[in-house]
Amino acid sequence: MTVEIEGVTLHLAHPDELSIQWVGQDELMRQLLAAWMVVNEQDLPMNPRLLGKPGVGKTTLAYAAGRRMGRDVYILQATLDTRPEDLLVTPVIEGGGNLRYVASPLVTAMIKGGIAIIDEGNRMSEKSWASLAPLLDNRRYVESIVAGIKIKAHPHFRLVATMNDDASTFELPEYIHSRLQPQIFIDFPERDEEHHILKENLPFAEERILSYVVDFLQMAHAADERYTVRDGINVGRFAIKLKSLATQRTHETEALEIAIVQVLGEEALRYVRRNRPSAS
């Protein structure tokens, strides 16, 4: 699909289609949707930040909130190498030497009135964030130097950034920090919620495996380890595969312990449940 802005034809990105849903922690969903609300014709939507450890569900929450609003969702993965043109418009040379201007997922969301997720936003440099400064205040536009155009955001456009709390990230400049508000912190889910998430992602898993993984995660959370439900899903999935390919009867616990070591490392075994169920 293409649109024309100030005489320049832009080729738009496709929305992301993911089969995921947000489970539990309804208050976090309420806070995100509230930040995006417009309560008066003079009001503006906010640009929230979702903060937390890797794997706690920040992107899942953002995507599910966008879909709950009935909007298309566009995800832009930020990296250390993300340039301003990657965020906005990229020129591509076609046959015959002609230039084709390709809109980023973020700019496509701006034009179409969708939801833009800047994933792991604090991996981007200040130069890249600076190109978004006018979008994040009451101006709500960006300027593409490459294409020589100004692009205004659709009234229905919404933006959210997810950010990990690890060391391999940049500090946000203050003028961006003040524009990405409110800050919504996502912590580890409660036991019942964690069980529900595992069951949603591993519907073919036996209850004993789900319970074992939940016990492991809850013990790790209590010790302030960084293991997340994403790690639990990987452990459970790998254990099921190991058990299904075994040439002899294999204890579930044996398969789970192998999976824990190979997904998280031997030090994670300190949080395993040592009672071994019968082989099956």
Regions found by a protein language model. Give the residues of each.
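AAA+ P-loop NTPase catalytic core and its hallmark functional loops
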Residues: 1-211, 278-280
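Short alpha-helix boundary/capping elements
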Residues: 40, 240-244, 264-268
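C-terminal engagement/docking regions of AAA+ P-loop ATPases
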Residues: 19, 66, 248-280
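Conserved AAA+ ATPase small/helical "lid" subdomain
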Residues: 202-254
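Generic hydrophobic secondary-structure packing signal
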Residues: 31, 58-61, 228, 232, ...
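Residues that form generic nucleotide/phosphate-binding pockets
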Residues: 197, 201, 212, 216-219, ...
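Short, hydrophobic/amphipathic alpha-helical patches that form generic packing surfaces
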Residues: 30-39, 234-238, 258-263
